[in-house]
A protein has these predicted regions:
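Hydrophobic alpha-helical transmembrane segments
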Residues: 12-17, 111-112, 139-140, 180
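Transmembrane helix-bundle signature of multi-pass membrane transporters/permeases
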Residues: 88, 100-103, 143-147, 175-178
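A juxtamembrane structural motif centered on a specific transmembrane helix
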Residues: 150-201
Length: 201
């Protein structure tokens, strides 16, 4: 939010670049020493690097999710016809829900879900850019960042692009508290949107 509110972006970009470099070095060091540690966080990294080697343990959920995505094909098996969710994918209703969507509705269904998220994020960006004051703009920018980050992290976990994080898919994954907070955020965004007065010629 400070990045959005501040007129100069160069210092923040430099900090982000330095942070990314440090993160890469840390991940490389962890990858080297991961095999000698029993820490479950390190175990997530080793599972991410070699899920097949941990198929009986920590890699089971990731592999079953990937099998579900692969078995769905382009149009899927049909709504409600997933077999992987019936005990094969642990906690399929939570952070692995996208793999079930891919199995039942295929790549086409997953693309539709991503397009809907894209439209929501586009609308939030529009509201943030046209908000009548900085306070409203920052509120909606925070909501945008929260939802976008959750969607990106969830997709990357399901496709095994990053280690498992436990981040759920907004509005789709199981969880009443999550939905309550997301709906509160949508209410705040709509409140800011109501006060936008676009100039018409």
């Amino acid at each position: 939010l400070i990045f959005v509110a501040h007129p100069k972006t160069k210092p923040f970009l430099m900090i982000a670049a330095i942070g990314a470099g440090i993160l890469i070095v840390i991940v490389a060091i962890l990858a080297v020493y991961a095999t000698n540690s029993d820490n479950f966080r390190i175990g997530r990294i080793t599972t991410w690097l070699d899920p097949e080697g941990h198929s009986d343990g920590t890699g089971f959920q990731v592999l079953q999710g990937l099998y579900a995505i692969g078995s769905g094909g382009f149009f899927g098996k049909g709504l409600g016809n997933s077999t992987q969710k019936l005990g094969m994918i642990p906690e399929a209703q939570n952070d692995m829900i996208l793999s079930v969507i891919c199995e039942e509705l295929g790549v086409f269904g997953a693309i539709v879900v991503l397009i809907l998220f894209g439209l929501l994020l586009y609308r939030l960006m529009f509201i943030a850019r046209n908000a009548p004051d900085l306070y409203g703009s920052l509120i909606v920018t925070g909501i945008f960042a929260h939802i976008a980050l959750q969607v990106i992290l969830n997709i990357m976990v399901v496709t095994n692009m990053i280690p498992t994080t436990g981040v759920t898919l907004p509005f789709v994954s199981y969880g009443g508290t999550s939905v309550l907070f997301l709906m509160t955020e949508m209410g705040l965004a709509l409140s800011v949107s109501r006060r936008i007065k676009l100039q018409t010629e």
